[in-house]
């Protein structure tokens, strides 16, 4: 292949990535997410006061954030942190493995909870009062590759569940019946 053919091929490849990057940038700007880190994007979407479902798709796996406008899918790696979103409930829940930031709706929106996450050695990772978002979920960023327990309490009722933050772990925990 000649030098000019290589340059043309390189230019086409570069312009393809530039087009993909500009489409992703336009999507982020359209939804008020431009200039944010992946953590900030996740927090912004999960905590939005808009009713579900949102006008775009956003879901989080153990390794990446997936955004879509229905035509293209944009994926952003999470890096060294893990996002766990959970929805305590009193009466009803839904099955969930990967949290849909744009679609999941829990039973108890805008409620105060006491949240505690401990690792398998008993070290406290998170311990604080948190309010569920409009979608009824609460999200926490945790260290990757840990096992532990999530405990939640509300009005004298408690729920707990084993958790893990590995590459194959769930990011949506809805099995938290308050008793």
Model feature map: region roles:
Residues 1-7:
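Bacterial N-terminal signal peptides that target proteins for export
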Residues 132-140, 150:
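Glycine-centered loop-to-beta-strand initiation motif
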Residues 76, 82-89, 167-179:
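Extracellular beta-sheet/turn segments enriched in Thr/Pro/Gly and aliphatic residues
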Residues 122-135:
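Short, acidic Ser/Thr/Gly-rich low-complexity loop/linker segments typical of extracellular
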Residues 21-84, 94-100:
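Terminal, intrinsically disordered low-complexity segments enriched in charged/polar
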Residues 15-20:
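N-terminal signal peptide c-region/cleavage motif recognized by signal peptidases
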Residues 80-124:
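Mature extracytoplasmic domains of secretory-pathway proteins
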Residues 146-154:
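A short, solvent-exposed beta-strand micro-motif common in secreted/extracellular proteins
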């Amino acid at each position: 292949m000649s030098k000019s053919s290589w340059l043309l091929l390189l230019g086409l490849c570069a312009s393809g990535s530039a087009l993909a990057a500009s489409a992703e940038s336009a999507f982020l700007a359209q939804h008020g997410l431009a200039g944010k880190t992946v953590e900030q994007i996740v927090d912004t979407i999960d905590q939005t006061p808009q009713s579900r479902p949102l006008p775009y798709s956003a879901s989080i796996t153990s390794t990446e954030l997936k955004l879509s406008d229905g035509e293209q899918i944009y994926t952003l790696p999470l890096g060294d942190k893990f996002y766990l979103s959970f929805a305590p409930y009193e009466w009803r829940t839904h099955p969930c493995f990967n949290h849909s930031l744009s679609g999941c709706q829990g039973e108890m929106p805008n409620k105060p909870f006491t949240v505690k996450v401990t690792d398998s050695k008993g070290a406290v990772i998170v311990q604080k009062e948190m309010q569920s978002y409009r979608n009824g979920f609460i999200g926490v960023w945790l260290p990757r590759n840990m096992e532990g327990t999530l405990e939640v309490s509300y009005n004298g009722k408690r729920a707990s569940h084993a958790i893990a933050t590995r590459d194959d772990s769930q990011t949506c925990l809805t099995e938290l019946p308050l008793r």
